[in-house]
Amino acid sequence: MHRIGNAVRMASSSSANATITARHTQYSHAKTGGFSQTGPTLHNPYKDDPILDRTLRRLLPESEYMRVAADLSKFGDRITSEVEHLGRQAELEQPRLEHQDAWGKRVDKLIVCNEWHKLKQICAEEGVISIGYEDSVDPFVRRIHQVAKLFLFSPSAGLVSCPMAMTDGAVKTLTSLNLYGKHKLATEAVDRLRSRDPSKAWTSGQWMTEKKGGSDVAGGCDTYAVQIDKDTYRLHGYKWFSSAVDADVALTLARIVDSDGNALEGSRGLSLFLLKIRDESGNLNGIQMVRLKNKLGTKQLPTAELLLDGAIAERIGDQGRGVAGISNMLNITRIHNAVASLGYMRRIISLARDYSTKRVVFGQTQSKWPLHTTTLAKMEVDTRGSMLLLFEAARLLGLSEAGKSSDVEAMMLRLITPVLKLYAGKQAVPMVSEGIECFGGQGYMEDTGLPTLLRDAQVTPIWEGTTNVLSLDVLRVFSGKENILLAFGKRVEQLLGNTKTEDEKLKKSKEAVESALKQLQKLLVKASDSAIQGETRIDSVARHIAFTIARIYSGALLIDHASDSSVANQSDIEVAYRYCCEQPLIDLRWEWFASERVKADREIVFDNFTALEKSKI
């Protein structure tokens, strides 16, 4: 009996252990194989850039170059160690708006993440705005320094670069109107907008867009100003697209209402106003935040519709000169827009280049497959051309602010600003898309952060004037009193004058630019003569003209850079040759100018458009 009892107990114990073991094995890690991909690494964007350092070395005096290079190198380390993470978090923790508190009180509380606030603090600490206005530094140097720093910052900035653009534009506007030291609010605003102290620094908004339209400022403005006393007014209107609504001050346009309740229409009726967004108690200044915009990209950035119902503002500048007053702002923000475009282009190339050394496909890394490196090389060539165009704009802006511009340089600044903005914006979207393709399916995955670059880049051809709007602005530049076409030719010839013609590739590059320039000049002169007879519509080819100017100018800059043996290397020569000789610098034909072609365009576009008869088209 004793043996039988032991046997029963052993059998029972064995059964229990089996049950425990069976239950235990229900829990184990999934077997997914040992392979995982290695993502791209963001290196110091200053040290990692193939052309930025050489460009600055050429443009700046040696002592200034050393100072600027040290600052940018240090900032590049901060971008990789801190800024990039903050910008990513701003995308993941997007702003939201609470209209009412729990008790039904209207509060219009804008909630942004801590990372957004930290990024704004970093902008002040790093002097992102103040660098452009430091009295102790030559304006020529400081603008180049500022643009370089913004270029490094922009793709990691979590769209804080947008309020920085508007802040820079506001400082430029207020100082250009000679208000500093003469106007209390303007003086305080300038000091705070360019402050390096995060506890004192302000940011500015610009509220120009209304329901009737964006770029048509004169026709679209439906905001009215009722005078309280000499220069103080109450504003009433609806601002349709207002970015960075957590700003401290804003510049806006409005129509002054006279004593009879009438307001002048058109651009002559617009005046410029400066207002604080909140009063001393922190309450909104006669402003209601109606809603945050649901945008394709730039989701980190709080963009709102605003109802102005008695917002107290101060008129700055002469009455009826509002459009002229914002011209300086637009020049600055358009350069910032180009910085953003090129920042996205450079970032996607840098990440794709790094990834190509890690991703193994068909037995070797992407970097060893000729087709892949050819793709990246084409992207690099186009980016370098526009990068030099950007720093040409920075150089010209600095010379203008220093009062050192020649007549040709002054005209080139007016021409290059819209050309740079529209061309870089038009390049950015397809290039970032191409770069995302370099990552295969991973480029399409939201949690890699790569799609954010594409969505955010899409705004750059739209903000501060679409491609078509700015192309028409380029035509207005040519229709002015100055002979811009002649000045453009002189600048290109000046750049080509240093060409190392003993180098066959540079010689051919120079010939290609000269040929394209002559063709453009011939076509524009011919079109101007025929336009009197109504045979041509030069406006229909405005974007082709603008693109051609961008390519010719960029090509000449690349040749000039590659001919400087003190900084250039063999890749600079190859880039200049590929840019100028392996792709068309001019994409323009005489038959495209014909008035009859416009009629044919309409027939193509509205073929079988059933709503045509009911529309006003």
Curated annotation (Swiss-Prot):
- Residues that hold substrate according to the record: S215, S267, R334
Q: Which GO terms describe its biological process?
A: adaptive thermogenesis; fatty acid metabolic process
How does inactivating the gene affect the organism?
Answer: Temperature-sensitive mutants in which embryos develop to adulthood at 15 and 20 degrees Celsius, but have a poor survival incidence at 25 degrees Celsius. Mutants have increased membrane fluidity and abnormal compositions of fatty acid species.
Cite the effect that the entry attributes to G158R: In n5661; suppresses the defects in egg-laying and response to reoxygenation of paqr-2 mutants
Region described as Disordered = 1-47
**Composition bias, kind Polar residues: at what positions?**
23-41
The EC designation for this entry is 1.3.99.-
Description of what induces expression: By heat. Two-fold induction at 25 degrees Celsius compared with 15 degrees Celsius.
What is the top-level taxon of the source organism?
Eukaryota
Q: Where is the signal peptide?
A: none
**What are this entry's molecular-function GO terms?**
acyl-CoA dehydrogenase activity; fatty acid binding; nucleotide binding
Q: Where does FAD bind?
A: 206-215, 241-243, 359, 366-369, 437, 441, 464-466
What are the UniProt keywords, alphabetically?
A: FAD, Fatty acid metabolism, Flavoprotein, Lipid metabolism, Nucleotide-binding, Oxidoreductase
Q: Where is the composition biased (Low complexity)?
A: 11-22
Q: Outline what the protein does.
A: Promotes adaption to elevated temperatures by regulating expression of the lipid desaturase, fat-7. Binds selectively and with high affinity to fatty acids with chain lengths from C10 to C12 and prevents them from activating fat-7 expression mediated by the nuclear hormone receptor nhr-49, leading to low levels of membrane lipid desaturation and membrane fluidity for adaption to heat.
Q: Which family does it belong to?
A: Belongs to the acyl-CoA dehydrogenase family.
Q: How does it assemble?
A: Homotetramer; dimer of dimers.
Q: What is this protein called?
A: Acyl-CoA dehydrogenase family member 11
As recorded in Swiss-Prot or TrEMBL, the protein's gene is named acdh-11
